[in-house]
């Protein structure tokens, strides 16, 4: 933004129609072509709709509420972000259905999420992948009136960065969550983009598919613990979304 425009609103700045090359902009500058953004938004929305899948675009990189609004207007189910600080920004910008695509370990963040969900003002979901993580969540909301946490059980790959590797452990964590009426299991998730050795060539493809099948298997175990009519089955990146669609389509039941 030009120095002379600092302190103005976004709408006022855009209305001023500053010239990128003659105004007092500070470089370097990244610019986005509006037509390209709109093309990408509509293309992904159309792709997901054609398959019967919902999209919760990850907005951690742009963190631009105006772009996120366009994605929601195009049919996105909600938004994904990386942590609670990002969730706070998007929530304060008017977006109420948010998935934090990570475990949340900070007690103050967990307590705030529980307050928002409990008040009915928002639907903020985050990951749990262990009994230790569950215990942190439970301890964080002890003093929160009407606390409500919405969680996805994260499934992980062997030698991966996070997530439950063992479906027997998944059953144990689910059984513990069921004892706590403040915590709502919404479904399962996993990030296929970080599967060790995964890719688009030869045996790399099967490694991705095996992991996605593990998520589907986990969903079948998790479904009886979900209080909603539909379970959420989610996977992550932008590299293998076609494999995700093919493998998740094999889930036999109602899902989001």
Task: Walk through the language-model features, giving the residues of each.
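Surface-exposed amphipathic alpha-helices with a cationic face
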Residues: 41-49, 68-72, 138-145, 178, ...
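N-terminal glycine-rich anion-binding loops that anchor highly charged ligand groups
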Residues: 13-17, 36-63
């Amino acid at each position: 933004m030009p120095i002379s425009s600092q302190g103005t609103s976004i709408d006022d700045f855009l209305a001023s129609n500053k010239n990128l090359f003659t105004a007092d902009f500070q470089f370097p500058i990244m610019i986005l072509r509006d037509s390209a953004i709109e093309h990408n938004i509509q293309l992904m929305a159309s792709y997901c709709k054609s398959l019967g899948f919902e999209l919760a675009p990850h907005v951690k990189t742009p963190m631009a509420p105006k772009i996120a609004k366009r994605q929601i207007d195009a049919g996105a189910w909600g938004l994904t972000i990386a942590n609670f600080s990002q969730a706070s920004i998007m929530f304060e910008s008017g977006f109420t259905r948010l998935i934090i695509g990570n475990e949340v370990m900070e007690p103050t963040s967990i307590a705030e999420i529980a307050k928002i969900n409990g008040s009915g003002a928002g639907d903020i979901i985050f990951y749990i992948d262990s009994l230790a993580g569950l215990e942190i969540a439970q301890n964080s909301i002890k003093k929160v009136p009407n606390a409500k946490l919405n969680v996805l059980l994260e499934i992980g790959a062997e030698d991966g960065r996070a997530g439950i590797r063992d479906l027997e452990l998944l059953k144990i964590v689910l059984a513990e969550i069921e004892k706590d009426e403040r915590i709502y299991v919404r479904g399962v998730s996993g990030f296929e983009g970080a599967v060790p050795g995964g890719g688009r060539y030869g045996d790399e493809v099967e490694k991705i598919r095996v992991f996605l099948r593990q998520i589907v298997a986990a969903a079948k175990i998790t479904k009886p613990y979900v209080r909603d009519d539909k379970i959420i089955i989610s996977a992550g990146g932008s590299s293998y979304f076609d494999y995700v669609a093919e493998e998740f389509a094999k889930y036999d039941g109602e899902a989001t």
